[in-house]
Amino acid sequence: MTNTFTFNAKIKQINSHLPLFPENLDSFWDKEIKPLFTDESLSFMVKTLNGNYVKYVNLDNGATTTPFASVKQYVDQMLDTYGSVHRGSGQKSVITTQEYDASRNMIRDFVGSSSQNYVIFAKNTTEAINGAATLWAKKPGKILVSDIEHSSNLLPWITRDEFVQYRTQPDGSVSLSEIENIFKAHHNRSKGEQIKLLTITGASTITGYRPPIYEIAALAHRYGAKMFADVCQLIQHERVDMRPDDDPCHLDFVAFSGHKMYAPYGTGVLLGPKEFFDSSYPYQIGGGNLPYITRNLEIKRFYTERAHDPGTPNAMGAIAIAKSIQIIEALERSRIAQYEHSLVEFTFTRLQNIPGVKVYILGDNLAHVIPFDIDGFDGRLVAEILAQEYGIGVRAGAFCTYEYIRKLKNISDEQDLEIAKEVETGITRNIPSIIRASFAVYNTLEDCDRLINAIAQIAKNGFDYYLPYYTQDEITGVWTVTDR
């Protein structure tokens, strides 16, 4: 592995919101990270084009993460006692219900939530935000949403409700003064024209940029609005604190997913005030969450979290999140953040020195993601080469953040119009794309070195070198290995 002394010397000059990791990185990984995952997951071997097998490097952690070994083991054990939740008096039902209910309290503590907030489970973050957006659409006022949002925190709001979109800076960063100007412009209007809710990502899925969510929350509250934070790209890396309700910087709503924080089975979580959720019927209704219907079809309802659990819930997903939280807390999120940040700074510094490589990232706001391109290459081809020839998993695409990628790639209005016309005919190959390497706590300096060396070799070879070996689909733009 890379010499840690050399590593620390190289990244000393870069300013950061986090200090460098104070421990030896290799030692920390060997002693504290490696035991948390199965040997099979850490030593997963893949076959490359030359026929050799290499250890897989997972740098697509912004999409999903490998589960903790003890989470997997615990859930497997729980399956032996698995029973219906809130639906039976048998021992298996009681055991599963107790574990499921306890997971809510653990999640509430994990994000510093008030006891006056509900913890509502969903299929994923997308469904959680859709649920919140559906309920907010019943209330007068407008949603304030940024132009750097993932589609999951954009489409649910703009397709259901009146909205105002605020434009971020050319690099995707937020201007508090410009946000305040929007609040001021709407503040003295009628109730239906005022801003009722501001929603924003906690960390960008494409660059890792972290807007100042607590300062933004204070600004929203100053003008009588609520604050919604999509923290699914943040919570596994750094502490998210909703804060007490009387704190001007408190977050009124947060949403995230378990599968991005080392918990399998894909459960999403939505937290927000009881009074908000009790003020209307739940987003989804059905068996169990509305306990009685009279002969005259009068509906009697719960005013509890259970009102938002229609049907049989994904109990194993909720329990998996709770167990993952225990491990993350024991490891300490500040150490996770510093460790991952050190890997990113090391990789960032080296990639910048490779001729032909462009890194789309704010140098003083490095997080867990490095977005980049190689001159002359389609990003999707680079991702395919990394997988097929080097056993490295990254992702290339627009990452459902279309306006942000247009900013980063300087896509003109005319180009945007042409792309849109093509998409209407089913052609998606020219949708702009960027390569994203996204890091997790199980990544190592060796992973960083393998990525850096692979990118250097690809850039050196040049685009034409790969044309005989890879073919691009005329419609989708996807690259595949040419039959040989």
Describe these PLM feature segments.
Residues 2-484:
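Pyridoxal 5′-phosphate
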